[in-house]
Amino acid sequence: MKTIKYSLITLVAFILCATNSNAQMAKSAYFLDGSFYNHQLNPAMKPERAYFSLLTGTWSVAANSNFGISNFLYPYGDDKLTTFMSSHVDQDEFLNALPNSLQMSSDISTNLLGLGFRMFGGFTTFGITLNSSVSTNLPKGFFEFAKKGFQESSYSFSGINMNTMNYASINLGYSREVVEGLRVGVTAKYLVGLAYANFNVDKLNIEMSEDKWMIESHATAEAALYTEMSVDAGAMDDLNEPRIPLADVLSNTTDVNTIMQAAKPAAKGLAFDLGVSYDFGDLVDGLSVSASLLDLGSINWQYMTKFSTEDGKVEFDGIDEIDPNDFEGSLDKELEALGEDIEKMFSIPYSHGTQAYRTKLSPVMYLGAEYNMPFYHGLSVAMLYGKRFATYGGWDEVRGYVNLAPLKWIEASANVGYSTYGTTFGWMFNFHPRLFSFFIGSDYMVTKVTPQYIPVNNINGHITFGITKPIGKRK
């Protein structure tokens, strides 16, 4: 039993550790009028001036989870810790503190180029960005099995997932006021896929009885890279099978046409951001509302390699072929055979070949409202609701803001949010005089860590910063 337990726990650790560091746009900047990039959260938002940035516009890194180390380590004795597996930890206390699905997600984004200017009675934006997202999902059943063991006769671990999407986008946006107070905006994004991978266990069930165990599983995986050249490995002039990577093409040929054809992206797509904002003006002085839908689109991968397991079962009815003259040797052979069966069950050897495949982006919705104080227009309070639509790695969040702008070129925001990943504190400082603009902030703050700087509670951390060159006067 310990062998199977530790095999499954090892799989859990691998999936959790596979999560990479990643980022998202700063929601803390949503209501700051001096921000040059809140149009990425709502295309209807108009920067106060034209602007330009190269490589320094925005850098953002974030990671979130709905669990932390405090879910698995418990105080014991005098200044000691023990794991959830200890008999001193009550199983109901441990399991009731866990969410049904343990989620971890992360995002990285950066603006390589940013440009904004007034045109045709509105405001036009152009940008090139890099985006990377990773999400993992683990069912609670894993830890229920590890803690309870034989107390239950069956366990289901279906719903294990690990996904990563990496792409570049070329963005063109436009916004304008259509009637007094009402502003609309749209951003079109041409997407270039860089890498994609998805691992999903849609069935993993364990049935246990006194005389045998039965494990049933099915898993799938898909993977694609930026470009995978279809070239004859010898002649280098036949664009048919077998395919070889672009790096090998560059090392074996100097023909410009061959290299250019090899460098064509293997994945392309299109997405749109939509936004609207309304200032109530004299109807309700100081009140404005806004809404946006982001990442409505998909990427088409030309060379997606797909794998799957066949529906498999592993049955273990005990160890009965023990040689009394070689107890340790024969026991090792039995356990080794069992381990090989489990390894085969989790391996994904069956390839369905390379084929075109479409992956949808995970859309995000924002609904916002802001009220400027009548006694001091540099002070406002606001609320923002956000939702990410995704099978795995989705979230809901409500965030309350206090925004302060004591001078035209200095503004700050402090906010508190409650989301799928718990309660968090965010902040943003924006310094934007005439010659340059600098901002730094965070949507998620880690408030408690171990002596080894490991977050104690939910792993919610984020940092974003950037420098932009303003152009022209405020308007």
Protein language model regions, located:
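Bacterial Sec-dependent N-terminal signal peptides
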Residues: 1-27, 369
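Subset of outer-membrane beta-barrel
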Residues: 24-475
